[in-house]
Protein backbone atom coordinates (compact mmCIF):
# COMPACT_ATOMS: atom_id res chain seq x y z
CA UNK A 1 0.00 0.00 0.00
CA UNK A 2 2.80 2.39 0.94
CA UNK A 3 4.59 1.61 -2.31
CA UNK A 4 1.42 2.36 -4.24
CA UNK A 5 0.97 5.72 -2.50
CA UNK A 6 4.61 6.62 -3.13
CA UNK A 7 4.20 5.68 -6.78
CA UNK A 8 1.14 7.88 -7.13
CA UNK A 9 2.92 10.79 -5.46
CA UNK A 10 5.89 10.36 -7.79
CA UNK A 11 3.61 10.39 -10.83
CA UNK A 12 1.88 13.54 -9.52
CA UNK A 13 5.21 15.33 -9.00
CA UNK A 14 6.41 14.38 -12.48
CA UNK A 15 3.14 15.56 -14.03
CA UNK A 16 3.26 18.92 -12.26
CA UNK A 17 6.86 19.43 -13.34
CA UNK A 18 5.73 19.26 -16.97
CA UNK A 19 3.10 21.99 -16.58
CA UNK A 20 4.01 25.56 -17.64
CA UNK A 21 4.74 27.97 -14.83
CA UNK A 22 1.72 30.10 -15.77
CA UNK A 23 -0.58 27.25 -14.79
CA UNK A 24 0.93 26.97 -11.34
CA UNK A 25 0.99 30.67 -10.54
CA UNK A 26 -0.33 33.89 -12.01
CA UNK A 27 2.18 35.89 -14.01
CA UNK A 28 3.48 38.98 -12.25
CA UNK A 29 1.52 42.06 -13.26
CA UNK A 30 3.62 44.72 -15.02
CA UNK A 31 2.80 48.38 -14.47
CA UNK A 32 3.54 50.37 -17.64
CA UNK A 33 3.75 53.74 -15.88
CA UNK A 34 0.60 55.27 -17.36
CA UNK A 35 -2.40 56.38 -15.32
CA UNK A 36 -5.77 57.34 -16.79
CA UNK A 37 -8.45 59.23 -14.85
CA UNK A 38 -12.12 59.48 -15.79
CA UNK A 39 -13.72 62.92 -16.45
CA UNK A 40 -15.53 62.86 -13.09
CA UNK A 41 -12.40 61.69 -11.23
CA UNK A 42 -14.23 58.67 -9.78
CA UNK A 43 -12.07 56.18 -11.67
CA UNK A 44 -8.29 56.01 -11.81
CA UNK A 45 -6.75 53.16 -13.79
CA UNK A 46 -3.10 52.18 -14.14
CA UNK A 47 -2.24 50.62 -17.49
CA UNK A 48 -0.79 47.16 -16.82
CA UNK A 49 -0.02 43.87 -18.53
CA UNK A 50 -3.48 42.66 -17.51
CA UNK A 51 -5.60 45.47 -18.96
CA UNK A 52 -3.51 47.07 -21.73
CA UNK A 53 -5.61 45.64 -24.58
CA UNK A 54 -8.78 47.36 -23.30
CA UNK A 55 -7.90 49.72 -20.47
CA UNK A 56 -11.33 51.27 -19.89
CA UNK A 57 -13.27 48.08 -20.73
CA UNK A 58 -15.21 49.88 -23.46
CA UNK A 59 -12.84 49.63 -26.42
CA UNK A 60 -11.77 53.28 -26.31
CA UNK A 61 -8.23 52.98 -24.92
CA UNK A 62 -5.54 50.41 -25.70
CA UNK A 63 -1.78 50.32 -25.29
CA UNK A 64 1.13 48.65 -27.08
CA UNK A 65 3.93 48.16 -24.53
CA UNK A 66 6.48 47.40 -27.25
CA UNK A 67 6.04 50.62 -29.23
CA UNK A 68 4.77 52.77 -26.32
CA UNK A 69 1.70 53.75 -28.37
CA UNK A 70 -1.53 54.59 -26.52
CA UNK A 71 -4.49 54.48 -28.91
CA UNK A 72 -7.54 56.64 -28.23
CA UNK A 73 -10.64 55.59 -30.16
CA UNK A 74 -13.61 57.84 -29.38
CA UNK A 75 -12.29 58.17 -25.82
CA UNK A 76 -13.64 60.59 -23.21
CA UNK A 77 -11.07 60.95 -20.42
CA UNK A 78 -10.20 63.21 -17.50
CA UNK A 79 -6.41 63.19 -17.68
CA UNK A 80 -3.43 61.03 -18.62
CA UNK A 81 -0.23 60.78 -16.60
CA UNK A 82 2.79 59.04 -18.12
CA UNK A 83 5.85 60.18 -16.20
CA UNK A 84 7.34 56.74 -15.56
CA UNK A 85 7.80 55.35 -19.08
CA UNK A 86 11.33 55.36 -20.51
CA UNK A 87 10.45 56.07 -24.16
CA UNK A 88 8.35 59.00 -25.44
CA UNK A 89 4.63 58.31 -25.22
CA UNK A 90 2.79 58.32 -28.54
CA UNK A 91 -0.94 58.99 -28.75
CA UNK A 92 -2.59 57.48 -31.82
CA UNK A 93 -5.86 59.24 -32.56
CA UNK A 94 -8.88 57.45 -34.02
CA UNK A 95 -12.22 59.27 -34.39
CA UNK A 96 -13.12 62.06 -31.90
CA UNK A 97 -11.45 62.11 -28.48
CA UNK A 98 -11.67 64.45 -25.50
CA UNK A 99 -9.59 64.91 -22.36
CA UNK A 100 -11.26 67.26 -19.88
CA UNK A 101 -9.90 67.62 -16.36
CA UNK A 102 -12.61 67.27 -13.69
CA UNK A 103 -14.35 70.47 -12.66
CA UNK A 104 -12.99 71.92 -9.43
CA UNK A 105 -9.72 70.00 -9.74
CA UNK A 106 -6.84 72.34 -10.56
CA UNK A 107 -4.76 69.87 -12.52
CA UNK A 108 -2.97 69.19 -15.80
CA UNK A 109 -4.63 67.14 -18.53
CA UNK A 110 -1.46 65.55 -19.91
CA UNK A 111 1.64 65.04 -17.75
CA UNK A 112 4.76 63.33 -19.17
CA UNK A 113 8.37 63.78 -20.25
CA UNK A 114 7.57 63.88 -23.97
CA UNK A 115 4.59 63.41 -26.25
CA UNK A 116 4.10 62.46 -29.88
CA UNK A 117 0.77 62.59 -31.74
CA UNK A 118 -0.10 60.49 -34.79
CA UNK A 119 -3.16 59.19 -36.63
CA UNK A 120 -5.98 60.91 -38.49
CA UNK A 121 -8.41 61.39 -35.61
CA UNK A 122 -9.13 64.41 -33.43
CA UNK A 123 -8.31 65.31 -29.82
CA UNK A 124 -9.60 68.22 -27.74
CA UNK A 125 -7.80 68.73 -24.43
CA UNK A 126 -9.29 71.16 -21.91
CA UNK A 127 -7.55 71.61 -18.56
CA UNK A 128 -8.09 73.57 -15.38
CA UNK A 129 -4.31 74.16 -15.31
CA UNK A 130 -1.93 73.19 -18.14
CA UNK A 131 -3.20 71.26 -21.13
CA UNK A 132 0.21 69.58 -21.41
CA UNK A 133 2.77 69.59 -18.60
CA UNK A 134 6.31 68.34 -19.26
CA UNK A 135 8.78 67.41 -16.52
CA UNK A 136 11.99 67.95 -18.51
CA UNK A 137 11.34 70.74 -21.00
CA UNK A 138 8.66 70.66 -23.66
CA UNK A 139 8.94 67.82 -26.16
CA UNK A 140 5.84 67.78 -28.36
CA UNK A 141 5.67 66.27 -31.85
CA UNK A 142 2.66 65.94 -34.13
CA UNK A 143 2.59 64.15 -37.47
CA UNK A 144 -1.16 63.96 -38.05
CA UNK A 145 -4.67 64.46 -36.73
CA UNK A 146 -6.33 67.58 -35.35
CA UNK A 147 -5.35 68.53 -31.80
CA UNK A 148 -6.70 71.36 -29.64
CA UNK A 149 -4.91 72.19 -26.39
CA UNK A 150 -6.86 74.52 -24.12
CA UNK A 151 -6.04 75.64 -20.59
CA UNK A 152 -4.78 78.27 -18.19
CA UNK A 153 -1.44 77.55 -19.87
CA UNK A 154 -1.15 75.40 -22.97
CA UNK A 155 2.36 73.95 -22.89
CA UNK A 156 4.25 74.13 -19.59
CA UNK A 157 8.04 74.10 -19.89
CA UNK A 158 10.79 76.70 -20.12
CA UNK A 159 12.70 75.00 -22.93
CA UNK A 160 12.34 72.33 -25.60
CA UNK A 161 10.43 72.25 -28.86
CA UNK A 162 7.01 71.98 -30.45
CA UNK A 163 7.44 70.16 -33.76
CA UNK A 164 4.63 69.98 -36.32
CA UNK A 165 5.15 67.88 -39.46
CA UNK A 166 1.52 67.02 -40.16
CA UNK A 167 -2.05 67.71 -39.07
CA UNK A 168 -3.43 70.79 -37.34
CA UNK A 169 -2.65 72.13 -33.87
CA UNK A 170 -4.79 74.71 -32.08
CA UNK A 171 -3.59 76.37 -28.87
CA UNK A 172 -6.03 78.25 -26.63
CA UNK A 173 -4.55 79.88 -23.53
CA UNK A 174 -1.15 81.17 -22.45
CA UNK A 175 1.58 80.54 -25.06
CA UNK A 176 4.31 83.16 -24.48
CA UNK A 177 7.21 80.85 -25.42
CA UNK A 178 5.95 79.63 -28.80
CA UNK A 179 8.23 81.87 -30.86
CA UNK A 180 11.22 80.11 -29.23
CA UNK A 181 9.75 76.60 -29.16
CA UNK A 182 8.09 76.24 -32.55
CA UNK A 183 9.70 73.93 -35.10
CA UNK A 184 7.25 73.74 -38.00
CA UNK A 185 7.64 72.37 -41.52
CA UNK A 186 8.12 74.90 -44.31
CA UNK A 187 4.75 75.94 -45.67
CA UNK A 188 2.97 75.66 -42.32
CA UNK A 189 0.27 78.29 -41.88
CA UNK A 190 0.20 80.13 -38.55
CA UNK A 191 -2.78 82.25 -37.49
CA UNK A 192 -3.44 84.28 -34.33
CA UNK A 193 -6.78 85.41 -32.90
CA UNK A 194 -8.11 87.70 -30.18
CA UNK A 195 -10.23 86.25 -27.37
CA UNK A 196 -13.40 87.33 -29.20
CA UNK A 197 -12.31 85.37 -32.27
CA UNK A 198 -11.23 88.32 -34.38
CA UNK A 199 -8.26 87.75 -36.66
CA UNK A 200 -4.88 89.08 -35.50
CA UNK A 201 -3.08 87.97 -38.63
CA UNK A 202 -1.77 84.92 -40.47
CA UNK A 203 1.65 83.91 -41.79
CA UNK A 204 3.19 81.12 -43.84
CA UNK A 205 6.32 79.69 -42.21
CA UNK A 206 9.18 80.23 -42.44
CA UNK A 207 8.64 83.95 -42.69
CA UNK A 208 10.91 86.95 -42.38
CA UNK A 209 8.17 88.76 -40.53
CA UNK A 210 8.56 88.73 -36.76
CA UNK A 211 5.22 90.45 -36.22
CA UNK A 212 3.52 87.28 -35.03
CA UNK A 213 5.94 86.73 -32.14
CA UNK A 214 5.28 90.25 -30.90
CA UNK A 215 1.55 89.51 -30.82
CA UNK A 216 1.77 86.39 -28.64
CA UNK A 217 1.06 88.28 -25.43
CA UNK A 218 -2.10 89.67 -27.02
CA UNK A 219 -3.34 86.53 -28.76
CA UNK A 220 -5.76 84.16 -27.05
CA UNK A 221 -5.63 81.50 -29.76
CA UNK A 222 -3.11 80.14 -32.26
CA UNK A 223 -3.66 77.67 -35.09
CA UNK A 224 -0.89 75.82 -36.89
CA UNK A 225 -1.77 73.90 -40.05
CA UNK A 226 0.89 71.72 -41.68
CA UNK A 227 1.26 71.76 -45.50
CA UNK A 228 -0.10 68.21 -45.88
CA UNK A 229 -3.23 69.16 -43.93
CA UNK A 230 -3.65 72.25 -46.11
CA UNK A 231 -3.45 70.11 -49.26
CA UNK A 232 -6.06 67.68 -47.90
CA UNK A 233 -8.40 70.57 -47.09
CA UNK A 234 -7.99 71.96 -50.60
CA UNK A 235 -8.78 68.59 -52.17
CA UNK A 236 -11.87 68.23 -49.99
CA UNK A 237 -13.23 71.48 -51.39
CA UNK A 238 -12.97 70.25 -55.01
Name every feature range the model reports, one short phrase each:
Residues 1-10:
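Positively charged n-region of N-terminal signal peptides that target proteins for export
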Amino acid sequence: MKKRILSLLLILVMTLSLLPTAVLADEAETDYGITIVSPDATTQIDVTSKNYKDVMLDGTVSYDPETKVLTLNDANLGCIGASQIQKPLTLRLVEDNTITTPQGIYSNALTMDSLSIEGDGRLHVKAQLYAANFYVGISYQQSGGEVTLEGFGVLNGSSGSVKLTGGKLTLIGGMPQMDKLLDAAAGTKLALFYEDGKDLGSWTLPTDSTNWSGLLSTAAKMTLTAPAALDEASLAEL
